[in-house]
């Protein structure tokens, strides 16, 4: 069309926040008063921003939010410290936890006069995208500020060089030049290592006699009297923002009698977008409203900002309790993870039994975004009984409004939408809803709205629609159950010709269904379905060759679900059921009489006559005694009949693809196959590169999807072959699922080849070696002729640690579960020393699953020697880098049963690190070649032929690297060529190290009586220690050991100087110098005099120690004895190694005493760099000195940065809260 044809066209706003597809729009037109009012929706997500557009008030003027809660703990602040306020005329003043002076308003009501203080670094809980934006601005600000300081320092240096163009010869001018150069170098270094810790907020908490009040110094000035004290959000729905730059909204909650304050801010934009789809209310532009603009919201943040908004089991557990406290009617969960075991786990039990079961909370959740292969639904949405799982659908109206396509395609589930069935046979997806929207996001994102798509968007679309139904039912005081709601939306959904008969939510139809229901009838109740064969628990699921080669009988125990207190109803329950099957290959009884305890129902499935591919049917149970004859429950039956591969290649020719078309093939991998090679070539002409989505999926018992499935997005270009390799398991049917990306509009014709490869170790799937065995034979077999160049390389090593301390204790009030049980915490602490900068992975010997887990949560943090938190993680093995230093790993494990935690009191921490130099193990043809050291040489292996070789397992000499310990476990893999797929894991247990201890002469074994007596000092109390020291001084007056011991004990300055002088008087300095000068020229072949070595080493160490004490003392005495200080300083530097940390300490003190602040700062920065993670260094004192030096230099910008950095590196609140 020409431009004039569009002049009168309006934007298709109906597709922006889709509501027609679900009948939500039509329902609101019919019943405008049932717009969600009276319904409270809980949103378990990244948190919802109360300042976002459309989320202020409901259609009736009520606050849109009833509550906002951070369930993760990321925003927790330790406010346990109480301080007294001083009267400063117009204000009250206190010292905040950060060290700032805070001004308080005298008008604040605080009857107890008790002020609790804490502080919080913003970047510990700000969303990741906001942190990045602010860090970019901070870097720009730093560059601007530092350029000015650097320009001033450079100008001053230039003036000096103009005055002294040649290198100055006198000491004073030379020191001035060095000072000016050091200032320039320090500014450059400060800029280079700049890692702004971000804003630091002081937090003040007090009780006004009715409620706790919280004030946050969000502008970091100390003038907190300018801020309004906030109450818990649920008290008055009060919130604020940190500033005009970040625009991040926050509310507060106070716990544990004021000792913990929770700052509630979002951890991402996701949850706000979800809230907009559910219930945004835009009075001036109602077409942008969410599905239920009249509902109220409770934001429950389960996405932990410390983990880039990943949900945690602990947060989920807390959220379930908050759902009960806040009287939530329906919840949306647009979160999920893979689960190896469906419908089982502590979080699942809370959702299924405590919320949906006992309290009729309607649960709506996303199905997952791991399609289009089958059995890709995630937990909790797609795998949990009584949860409404929502798939994502896209319609032509959405395509027009949201995706800017050149033309639309057929309405379709999104390509990436997860599909059922679940591993235990349930259909997985309950209904479909629109899976995309353009709606509200938090102001901090600097956007008013944003396009997002996913089942994360389809779930709130359905949740909002169902909220309309609940609004109508509650307004009419009509009872309902969560089970009845789920059945209504499923059985009235619009037919989409889906593979599992899953339809589109139809709000109006579902409401009519419920309006005509008698909620005392059988269908209002849940029915549990438990099968007795293999994976077929909640339905029949046949997929592997042995399951489909003959008919099978399945017994399902089906029972109505009754809660505690419903014993009477259970005893009187009886229903007459008529059963029907939807496919002729499924058989079930025609009638069943069922009591409250349930009944066994046999189901026979005969897949023998079915063609290869997917087949689906159901056993439907109807209430035969009810006129409506509605379906009471159903047993799904899924058969995926695989095809056998006649050889090692599966080929498809001239396969046509177009948008929305999905092609599936179920294949039985050849025995021995370990990976497939997929080759794709376009045989049709293409205007541009197209996209082919390929999923290679297998269902492996108790295995998460991401460990059994691979998704590939392959670019397809004309006349080019694209190849991908995918690892597989030969024991399970493989689904090869191929789809053109739904929005890739150009059709294409492809040739596809799937080649199976595999060389397997005959006895097992991994190789475990013990180094002390010396050798081990390995037998291999292949499914086809392959290159055979085996190579075993060990690249990593694993060190295991047991806790040094473990405490089990109950948590606080917010960790009481919905059933009244208290959560208990196991806190295990591990000490780890890192010798050099290292990248490592940490994991603990517990299940690494989110939803299918027997614990209510696990979390760990890593702290350095100054109690700075340097890393945190959860159930997933995480990689992190640690600098040289001493660290504590703290591991939190949660359960309602302390006896369960007791079993894990000594849980093992495993740290995996890379070897500096990989170890390649020698291979030999046989044990004779092993003896002759004749290496293995082989080029090929033929199909069906077993090929053997011998591995040499001995590790010694250079291979036994210094970083390895005797209990280290080496890990690596066996490869058979250049291919990275089809490898075999290898582990090797190290032998004891060969002792390199030298023989000692008899004279060296004689005990040093003096040293023994000196050592006794450390075991004596004060008075006895003083008495014993006097005895030693009188008995061994000329003993260096005694004088050194005295130096450790005495504190008074003059006495320390006197002792240092006594030490120096006992040492022949010239003889000491000659000895060490000569030692540098002594060859290794000359025998060593060990006794003399020890004697001279003692003198050298004592000499250095005495000089250190003298220099430390002189540095505190200003300009007193300046020349003596300089002489001792120079002498000490001559004796210290450059790598000795005391060099920078001594330099720092000396330059500081000479008012050479640039040189002092340079030394201090080096000291922090080399020893900042050492527990032996007082980092807090060094940072305090750094701030002092920066003030003296006039570099106030850097002083403010270091002020915050000090709180981060040496937290005043000890270890961070979990």
UniProtKB/Swiss-Prot annotation:
SUPFAM superfamilies: Subtilisin-like. The active site is at residues 45, 270, 456. It holds the Pfam family TPPII. The modification Phosphoserine is found at residue 550. The lineage of its organism: Eukaryota, Fungi, Dikarya, Ascomycota, Taphrinomycotina. It comes from the Eukaryota. This is Tripeptidyl-peptidase 2 homolog. CDD domains: Peptidases_S8_Tripeptidyl_Aminopeptidase_II. It is found in: Cytoplasm. Keywords: Aminopeptidase, Cytoplasm, Hydrolase, Phosphoprotein, Protease, Serine protease.
């Amino acid at each position: 069309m020409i431009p004039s044809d569009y002049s009168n066209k309006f934007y298709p706003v109906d597709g922006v926040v889709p509501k027609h597809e679900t009948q939500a729009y039509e329902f609101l037109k019919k019943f405008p008063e049932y717009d969600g009012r009276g319904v409270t929706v809980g949103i378990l997500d990244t948190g919802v921003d109360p300042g976002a557009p459309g989320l202020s008030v409901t259609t009736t003027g009520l606050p849109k939010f009833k509550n906002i809660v951070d369930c993760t703990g990321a925003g927790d602040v330790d406010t346990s410290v109480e301080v007294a306020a001083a009267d400063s005329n117009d204000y009250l003043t206190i010292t905040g936890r950060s060290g700032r002076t805070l001004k308080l308003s005298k008008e604040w009501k605080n009857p107890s006069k008790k002020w609790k203080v804490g502080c919080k670094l913003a970047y510990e809980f700000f969303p990741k995208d906001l942190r990045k934006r602010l860090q970019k601005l901070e870097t720009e600000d730093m560059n601007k500020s530092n350029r000015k300081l650097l320009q001033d320092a450079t100008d001053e240096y230039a003036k000096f060089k103009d005055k002294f163009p040649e290198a100055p010869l006198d000491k004073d001018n030379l020191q001035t030049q060095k000072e000016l150069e050091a200032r320039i170098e320090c500014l450059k270094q400060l800029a280079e290592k700049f890692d702004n810790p971000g804003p630091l907020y002081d937090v003040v908490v007090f009780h006004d006699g009715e409620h706790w009040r919280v004030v946050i110094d969000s502008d970091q000035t100390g003038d907190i009297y300018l801020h309004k004290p906030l109450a818990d959000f649920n008290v008055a729905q009060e919130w604020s923002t940190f500033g005009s730059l970040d625009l991040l909204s926050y509310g507060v909650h106070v716990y544990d009698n004021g000792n913990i304050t929770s700052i509630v801010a979002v951890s991402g934009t996701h949850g706000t977008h979800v809230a907009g789809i559910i219930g945004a209310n835009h009075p001036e532009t109602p077409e942008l409203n969410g599905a239920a603009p009249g509902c109220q919201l409770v934001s429950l943040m389960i996405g932990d900002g410390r983990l880039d908004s990943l949900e945690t089991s602990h947060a989920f557990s807390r959220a379930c309790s908050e759902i009960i406290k806040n009287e939530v009617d329906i919840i949306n969960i647009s979160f999920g993870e893979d689960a190896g075991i469906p419908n089982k786990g502590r979080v699942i039990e809370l959702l299924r039994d405590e919320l949906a079961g006992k309290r009729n909370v309607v649960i709506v959740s996303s199905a997952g975004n791991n399609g289009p292969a089958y059995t890709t639904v995630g937990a909790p949405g797609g795998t949990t009984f009584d949860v409404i799982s929502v798939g994502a659908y896209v319609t032509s109206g959405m395509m027009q409004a949201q995706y800017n396509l050149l033309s639309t395609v057929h309405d379709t589930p999104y390509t990436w939408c997860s599909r059922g069935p679940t591993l235990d046979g349930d259909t997985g997806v309950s209904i479909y809803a629109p899976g995309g929207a353009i709606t509200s996001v938090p102001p901090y994102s600097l956007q008013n709205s944003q396009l997002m798509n996913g089942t994360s968007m389809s779930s709130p679309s359905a949740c909002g629609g169902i909220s309309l139904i609940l609004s109508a039912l509650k307004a009419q005081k009509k009872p309902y159950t969560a089970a009845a709601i789920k059945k209504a939306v499923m059985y009235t959904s619009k037919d989409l010709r889906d593979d599992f008969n899953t339809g589109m939510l139809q709000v109006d139809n579902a409401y009519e269904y419920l309006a005509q229901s008698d909620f005392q009838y059988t269908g209002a109740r849940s029915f549990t379905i438990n099968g007795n064969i293999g994976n077929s628990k909640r339905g029949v699921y046949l997929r592997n060759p042995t399951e489909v080669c003959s008919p099978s009988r399945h017994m399902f125990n089906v029972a109505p679900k009754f809660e505690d207190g419903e014993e009477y109803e259970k005893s009187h329950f009886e229903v007459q059921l008529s059963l029907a099957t939807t496919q002729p290959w499924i058989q079930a009884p025609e009638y069943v009489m069922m009591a409250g305890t349930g009944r066994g129902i046999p189901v026979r499935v005969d897949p023998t006559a079915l063609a290869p591919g997917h087949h689906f049917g159901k056993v439907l149970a109807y209430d035969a005694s009810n006129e409506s004859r509605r379906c009471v429950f159903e047993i799904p039956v899924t058969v995926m009949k695989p095809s056998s591969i006649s050889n090692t290649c599966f080929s498809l020719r001239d396969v046509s693809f177009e948008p929305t078309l999905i092609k599936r093939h179920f294949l039985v991998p050849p025995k021995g196959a370990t990976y497939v090679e997929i080759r794709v070539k376009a045989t049709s002409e293409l205007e541009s590169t197209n996209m082919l989505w390929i999923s290679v999926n297998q269902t492996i018992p108790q295995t998460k999807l991401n460990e059994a499935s691979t998704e590939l997005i392959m670019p397809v270009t004309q006349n080019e072959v694209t190849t991908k390799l995918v690892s597989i398991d030969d024991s399970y049917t493989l689904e090869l699922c191929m789809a053109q990306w739904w929005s890739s509009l150009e059709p294409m014709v492809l040739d596809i080849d799937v080649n199976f490869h595999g060389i397997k170790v005959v006895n097992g799937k991994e190789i475990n070696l013990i180094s002390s065995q010396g050798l081990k034979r390995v037998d291999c077999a292949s499914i086809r002729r392959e290159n055979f160049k085996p190579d075993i390389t060990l690249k990593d090593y694993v060190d295991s640690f047991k806790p040094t301390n473990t405490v089990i204790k109950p948590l606080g009030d917010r960790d009481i579960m919905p059933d009244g049980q208290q959560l208990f915490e196991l806190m295990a602490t591990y000490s780890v020393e890192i010798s050099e900068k290292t990248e490592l992975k940490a994991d603990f010997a517990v299940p690494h699953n989110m939803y299918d887990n027997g614990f209510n949560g696990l979390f760990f943090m890593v702290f350095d020697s100054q109690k700075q938190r340097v890393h945190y993680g959860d159930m997933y093995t995480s990689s992190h880098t640690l600098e040289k230093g001493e660290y504590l790993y703290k591991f939190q494990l949660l359960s309602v049963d302390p006896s369960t935690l007791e079993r894990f009191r000594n849980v093992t921490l495993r740290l995996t690190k890379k070897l500096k130099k990989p170890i390649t193990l020698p291979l030999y043809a046989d044990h004779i070649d092993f003896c002759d050291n004749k290496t293995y040489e082989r080029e090929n292996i033929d199909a069906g032929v077993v090929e053997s070789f011998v591995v040499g397992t001995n590790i010694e000499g250079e291979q036994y690297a210094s970083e390895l310990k005797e209990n280290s476990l080496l890990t690596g893999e066996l490869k058979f060529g250049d291919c990275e797929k089809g490898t075999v894991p290898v582990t090797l247990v190290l032998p004891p190290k060969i002792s390199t201890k030298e023989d000692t002469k008899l004279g060296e074994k004689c005990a040093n009586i003096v040293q023994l007596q000196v050592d006794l000092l450390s075991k004596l109390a004060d008075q006895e220690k003083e008495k014993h020291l006097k005895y030693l001084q009188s008995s061994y007056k000329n003993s260096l050991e005694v004088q050194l011991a005295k130096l450790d004990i005495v504190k008074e300055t003059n006495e320390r100087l006197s002792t240092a002088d006594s030490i120096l008087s006992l040492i022949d300095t010239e003889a000491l110098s000659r000895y060490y000068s000569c030692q540098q020229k002594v060859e290794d072949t000359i025998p060593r005099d060990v006794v003399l070595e020890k004697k001279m080493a003692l003198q050298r160490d004592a000499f250095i120690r005495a000089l250190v004490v003298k220099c430390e003392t002189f540095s505190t005495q200003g300009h007193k004895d300046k020349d003596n200080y300089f002489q001792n300083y120079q002498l000490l530097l001559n004796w210290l190694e450059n790598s000795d940390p005391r060099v920078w300490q001594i330099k720092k003190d000396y330059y500081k005493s000479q008012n050479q602040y640039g040189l002092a700062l340079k030394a201090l920065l080096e000291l922090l760099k080399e020893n900042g993670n050492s527990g032996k260094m007082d980092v807090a004192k060094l940072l305090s000195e750094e701030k002092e030096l920066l003030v003296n230099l006039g570099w106030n910008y850097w002083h403010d940065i270091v002020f915050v950095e000090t709180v981060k590196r040496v937290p005043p609140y000890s270890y961070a809260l979990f």
